[in-house]
Amino acid sequence: MASETALFFPPKQQPLLIRLVQSVSYLVLQRLYRCGLVVSDDDVAKLRAIAGARVVYVCNHPTMEDGMVLFSLAARVGQLWHYIVAKESFKGLQGRFLQWMGCYSIRRGLGDRASIAQTLSLLKESQAQVVIFPEGGCSYQNDTVMPFRSGAIQMPLQVVAQLTKKDPDVDLYVVPISLKYRYTQPMTVIIEETLQGLERTLGIIPTEPEDFYQRLLAIASLVITRIETEFGITADTEQSWNQRIDQLRHHGIAQCEQQLNLQPNGAPIRERVYKIQALLESEEPKTVAEDDALYWTTVRLLNFDAIYDGYVAADPTPERFLDTLMRLEREVYQVEHIKPKAHRQAIFRVGEPINLKHYVKDFRQDKASTVERLTEQLRATVQENLSR
């Protein structure tokens, strides 16, 4: 097994190269990612106003394109940021490029001491600016925020508590950033084509072709039933869809942990999945087929982690329809990542920066309670601004 040091990729920030890449980031975002950037002048000014301080940016993580979008936001603000990125992204030239851009790795689901130490070290530097996705991974949900992991607030609180022993007036801000996407064209035809593709593959003939929502429900119902059959679960017609989905999640994670002789630890399923993926990457494989099957189960678990019945019905926007349809495509077509269906706008809203020096006294008196309170405050702010 590789040493912990070998499993960590530190940042190797190259400022001149970053400025060069930032200068073309708008074009790259438009051409390669089919995405435009929307952020108000007031929000840009809000970020620039604290440019000379230590800052942690916490942002929700709805899609796999968020990293590039945040890099473009840094370019818009005119700043150089560091980014915490999942270790599996650091492969070959791409990995080196990420390091040059100021990214460093984290092994999700494990206590990655090297990554934590890097974050603590960076935040002790003046003008350090670090981006963290506190949900821990991609939610695939445009309008809802998953629970935040406490480390995003605990680490900067720990640093500011140390720094204020020498300088009581030291500033260290945490800034809640909300990110959502909007398609820039009518999506009716694309939704119709996506429904047709899934129906064709699953052998479904729609009884109400004009009712997109009922067609979505029919597809989802068959997909859930198929997974239940695969897992050997007898469907209980008295259960709600959310109960059935939750049962599938718990069955899937238990199956994975049993294969790896892991004891359930009560952590959220997403954290347990990341631990399994990290172990699959670092340990000697049993057989390729066994590891591939186990990895695919973890992908399915992440795909369905944040989904719930009612997400589309509550607000049937094109974005919510396609959030759900793309989840179903990943399951039916067995594809881990699906590209956006059309050009979108990435819309940022920046919350009021929180200066952690004002919470040092509380942190010293009751670390756990202070971290929990601020973590939930940040999550609620991101969700509130997302819903505006």
Give, region by region, the residue ranges found by the protein language model.
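Short glycine-centered, acidic/aromatic-flanked micro-motifs in structured strand/loop junctions
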Residues: C59-N60, R108, P134
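Membrane-interfacial terminal anchoring regions of lipid-handling membrane enzymes
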Residues: M1-E65, L73-Q79, K87, R113-A114, ...
